[in-house]
Amino acid sequence: MGKKFYAMMAVLAFAAGGMDVNAVYTLDGIEVSADRQKDRFGNMITEQSYYRTGGDVQVIDSDTIEKRHYTQVGDALKYIPGVQVQTPGGYRGGEYGYTQTHSIVSINGDARVIILVDGRRMDNSVGNPVADYAAGSKSIIDVNQIVGMDNIEKIEVIKGPGASIYGADATGGVINIITKKGALKPVGTIDFSAGSWKRFSYGLTYSGSNDTGKLRYFFAARRELSGDSHYHDGITGKNYTWHQTGYRDNTLNARVDYKFNDRHELAFSYNHMQGNDDYPLTAPDYRYLSDAEWNRIKKDYFQNDKYGNFDNPGYRNLWITWLGAYNIYNKNNYDLTYYFGKDHGMDSFIRFYDQHETYFGSFGAGDREDAPTPFTPAWDAWAKKNHKGRDKKSYFTQLKNRGLQIQYGKAVGKHDLLTTWTYDKSRYYDTHVRKKTTSSVERESVLGYVQDKIHITDRWEITPALRYSYYSDFAKVSKAGVHANAGKSVSVVTPSVVTQFAFDDTASIYAGWTKVYRPIRVGDYHLTNTDYSSGNKVDAKLEDEKGDVVTLG
C-alpha cells in the first residue's frame, strides 16, 4: 500500500475559559467523580487520562448522556467536532460485512479509529462485522454494538494517535468508553419512555456496596423495541410506512469490584448485547411501483442482467420482496482484572478477557420473479404466503477473542514509566447454512509498548515511546476441510514522541510525531471467500500499511 504521510495542522488551541482554581491536578490516588476537572495543560481528567500524552481530547460525561437521553453511542459522538457517524438511517442492526448497513465512526474523515472499553480494544484481528473487505471501509467495528448506554460513565474522544498505549494502527484516533462501577451508597433507577411507531424503552440500574465499602457492584438492563418507522419521501412529497424496520434490542451489564487494600483490587465485568432487527436494506422508490414499471424492473434484472438504478431505474424496489429479512447479533464479553499497584495515577494490573460474538440473519423470501406489484391486493396475498420467519438463516458467523493483558506503571523522579503487553488470539467462523459446513480463520497477536512521560518542568513534559506489534500468519480451514496458512508473521517496532507545554492556566500547545503501522487484515486478502487449496498470487502482492503522523495544536 506504500508509505503515506498524514499531517494535521491546527491553529494554536486555547483552553476555553479560565481554569478552576479549586481543581485538583494531582492524580495520585485520585477518585475521579463526574465533576469536570482539567490538568495543567487543559486536558480533561478521567480514570484513564494519565495514559494519554497530549492532543485534541474531548470527554462526554454521564451527566451529559443522561440529560440528553442518548440511546446509542453514535448519538453522543456525532456532537463532537470532527467526528462523523455514518448510520443506515431508519433501521437498526446490520448485515455482517456489509458496510452500508452499519454505524461507522470516523474522526476528521479517517475511519481507522480504535474503539476501547476501559482501555481494552474490542476489535477482532481476523473478522470484521463492518466490512468483509478493505474496499468497503477501514472501520473495524460498529460503534452502536459495543456496550449499553446505561453502563457508560464517560466517553473519551482522542483525535489522532494521542497515546502510545492504544496501538500503532490508530491513525484516525481513539474512542475509549469508561464504564460505571458501584456506588458507596445504594442507588437505583427505573426508566421508561414511549414514542411514535410503537417505540418503547425499559431500563433498570442498581448499584451499591457492602458495609465496609470494599465490595462494590453495578447492574444495568435495558430493552428497546419499535415497530415499522414512517418517513417523508422528498421525491414524491408523500408520507410512507417503511416496512421491515422494526427492532428489539436488549443490553445487560454487570460489574463487581472488591478492594483488598489501597494497592490490590479485583474487578469482574460482563457485557451482553443482543439485536433482533428487521432488515429492509433500503427504502422503496415509489416512482417505479406501477404494474408496468414493476414488470420492467423484474425483466431487466432477471432476464437482461441489469443491475443498479442507473441501468435499471427503480432497481432497489426488488428488495421489497425480501419479506421477513432480518439481522441478529448476540455478544457476550467477560473481563477479569486484578490490580496490584497504582503509582502517580498509573494502574498496574493483569487482565484476562473472553469475547463471543454471533451474527446471523436471512434475506427473507429473496429475489422473486413471480412477485406481483408491491402494495396491491395481489401483493398482500402473495406476501402473506411467502413471508419467512426467524427460523430461516442465510448466513451464520461467529467471532471469538481470548487474551491476556499486563500493565505496569512506576514513577521514578521526573519519569513516569508505563508499559502494557497484550496477547490476543482471534478466531473467525463462517458457516454455510445449507451445507452445514464451516470455514475458520485464526490469528495470534502480541501488542506492547514502553512509554516514559518526562516532567521536564511543571509546565512542560515530553513523552517518547516504543510500540511493538507482532501478528502471526493466518491459519485457515476451508469449508472443504483444507488446512492452510496465508500471509506471513510480522514483527514491527514503531517509535513516537509527543510533547505539550502550558503557557499559563488558559493556553497550551502540543505536538507529536509517530510511526503508524496497520497489518494486512483478513478482509484485505478476502480469505474467507477464497479456495484455500489454491494459491492467490494477487493477494501475495499486498503489503502492510506504514506511514507517519504529525500533529500540532
Language-model regions: role of each:
Residues 184-185, 193, 205-326:
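Periplasmic-side early beta-strands and strand-to-turn transitions of outer-membrane beta-barrels
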Residues 31-68, 130-135:
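N-terminal periplasmic "start-of-domain" segments of outer-membrane beta-barrel proteins
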Residues 259-274, 318-480, 485-486, 502:
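Face-selective signature of the C-terminal outer-membrane beta-barrel domain
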